[in-house]
Amino acid sequence: MNSSSIQRKILVTSALPYANGPIHLGHVLEGIQTDIWVRFQKAIGNECYFFCADDTHGTPVMLAARKEKITPEQLIERVGQEHYTDLTSFGINYDNYDSTHSKANQEISKDIYLKLKEKGHISKRSIEQAYCEKDRMFLPDRFIKGTCPNCNSKNQYGDNCEVCGATYNPKDLIDSHCTLCGTPPVVKNSDHIFFKLGNFHKKTEQSNVDFDLQSWIETSEAVSESEGVKKKLKEWFDAGLQDWDISRDGPYFGFEIPSEKNKYFYVWLDAPVGYMASSKNFFEKNFPNEPNKFDSFWKDKNSEIVHFIGKDILYFHTLFWPAMLEGSGYRSPSKIHVHGFIGVNGEKMSKSRGTFIKAKTFAKFLDAEHLRFYLAAKLGPGMDDIDLSFDDFVNKVNADLVGNLINSVSRVSTTILDTLDRTLGTVSEEGLALLEEILTQPVKTGTRDDSIQNIIKTAYEQRNYAKVMREITRLGDRVNRYVNDNAPWKLIKENPEKAREIVTAVLNASRFLAIYLYPVVPKISEQIYKLLNLKGSPEFKDLDKSRILEKTKINPYEMITKRVDEKAIKVMLEENKQSEHPKKEEIPKSSNKEEGIEISIEELSKVELRVGEIVEAKPVEGADKLVNVKVDLGELGIKNVFAGIKIAYQPENLKGLKVVVVANLKPRKMKFGISEAMLLASGEGESLSLFVPHKDAKPGDRLK
């Protein structure tokens, strides 16, 4: 972490949500990750701004508006409001949330293009494209379907086959058709405009600029944190950087390219420029007397520009975007932080499986601060995917947030404090020792000791939020032990002033923990501040013994947050599923199987159900439905199981999952090996769901 006391100037962005769909938990993950970092920077006194916008251009937006019989402008205005409402409901606090369909964005996009053209970074050439004569438009690859030329799978997109993975030219599709009207497309030539990306790679013959992308990536710290990112970038450099098609033919919703007829900027040119436009609109409105405010970030490398993105848009942000900026007189980003995807209950987000969770539905039934807390506990600095396991979510929030960090506040803020006229006393030597543990306790970090405060600050800076949460939770445990050891509910009867000392120490400790927690759960931290009769938002400069509260009045206690209600999760998941798949009337299936056969308790007792933990999972070659798992059953050892669950679970997501196992099943010889047990599951097809034990079950535990 930069330990300098000089205030840093930081401009932060998160990726732009596309205006053709609802906000889902993937968007929320990135928004929360970015917001935590921004709140931390502001809380330690840096000048930091957070910008985003709706990504509004492209064929899908144009066609969606046409389908609704409204203009694209009407569509993006409505969707933009919906997106902003959904994202901010999770406490994501933008300094400005804009739209890429703005005058500022058009002006900056035009300026960048003309400067690139002037410096020889733009070329034009004719290309072949699919054209629908009925709709009178050139078709993007995703608006063409047909039979794969490689494996003959039907209903595949124009650029790649989802069955065999082959990539191809749209004209190679068999029996191709326009997805809008079903008409077979024809091939037409069209002049397209290209950005000569190879000019910014010195290993290519045409390179003629000072800025070299590969050198920038290898020598700067912009994208150096993840081995996965560096490996992927090396692959792209080794393959050679190709010219990038930055134009689209009309009809197209976007900005027209200067001096070109019926040509529009491809959405990926003006989308990242939206970061700049959002900041420009904000600075002009809020700093009217500082006309150079925009340039002080986008042209001055003494400031910092930090992008948070998902790993699926790495190519655009690490290659095209910095080259466009440097080639047009602006500066390249300081940092590009890349995160992974979010899964739900061990699966990828999927509409068909009901795991594609919309932000609006989640926030309707569950506390958004709880999700912030949970995601922070899972997020590290790399681009690993994370999983939202709702069982783990319940346990983590109820135990670590409510049962630990909030519990220490509520235990001393109700009846005990009422008896003490809701007034703090002074902090005893023992209480001061507790506060020093929270503020300055030395902790071993590698070969040296560092204070707990610096460790937490450094972890925030490095986006290692999981480490932040571990340290804060550990401190919360310490405060609760202090409460237990001193039992103020007993002291209040024998020695009220001693009880007042205990309460004073605990509430000061809670105040300091609220400061540490503020970037993660701002509302909860502000509620603790309100309880303590403190004005404003928590700031890290108050993490000091000189800020201890003594002999002050404390406000009446109000509920800070509730435990997670598991019923609310079930209702949320069901409503989310129904919104994606409206319930259809089902025709009852006839069945020859006997149902409702009764068995005796003696027969049931023969079945040995135990908790197992999957320690290994892999697909079975030649078996589409099977997954080969090894299950740890505690004292019974590890058993080999072939389970027909592949339609619902990807093997790579199963490791570490606790399941219910029929442990005493007679081993069964199968074509692929011996299966020694059975995993319990319910449902069919993609709705199949493994039974997962509740709470802290251990491998080998027997079900009763």
UniProtKB/Swiss-Prot annotation:
CC cofactor: Zn(2+)
Catalytic activity: tRNA(Met) + L-methionine + ATP = L-methionyl-tRNA(Met) + AMP + diphosphate
Documented EC number(s): 6.1.1.10
Record domain tRNA-binding: where: 603-704
Superkingdom per UniProt: Bacteria
GO aspect biological process, one term: methionyl-tRNA aminoacylation
Subcellular location: Cytoplasm
Chief location: cytoplasm
InterPro entries: aa-tRNA-synth_I_CS, Anticodon_Met, Met-tRNA-synth_bsu_C, Met-tRNA_ligase_1, Met-tRNA_synth, Methionyl/Leucyl_tRNA_Synth, MetRS_core, MetRS_Zn
GO molecular function, one term: methionine-tRNA ligase activity
Residues given in the record as Zn(2+) binding sites: 148, 151, 161, 164
Keywords of this entry: Aminoacyl-tRNA synthetase, ATP-binding, Cytoplasm, Ligase, Metal-binding, Nucleotide-binding, Protein biosynthesis, RNA-binding, tRNA-binding, Zinc
NCBIfam families: metG, PRK00133.1
Similarity comment: family membership: Belongs to the class-I aminoacyl-tRNA synthetase family. MetG type 1 subfamily.
Annotated function: Is required not only for elongation of protein synthesis but also for the initiation of all mRNA translation through initiator tRNA(fMet) aminoacylation.
Subunit description: Homodimer.
Protein name as catalogued: Methionine--tRNA ligase
Originating species: Leptospira borgpetersenii serovar Hardjo-bovis (strain JB197)
Taxonomic lineage: Bacteria, Pseudomonadati, Spirochaetota, Spirochaetia, Leptospirales
The gene coding this protein: metG
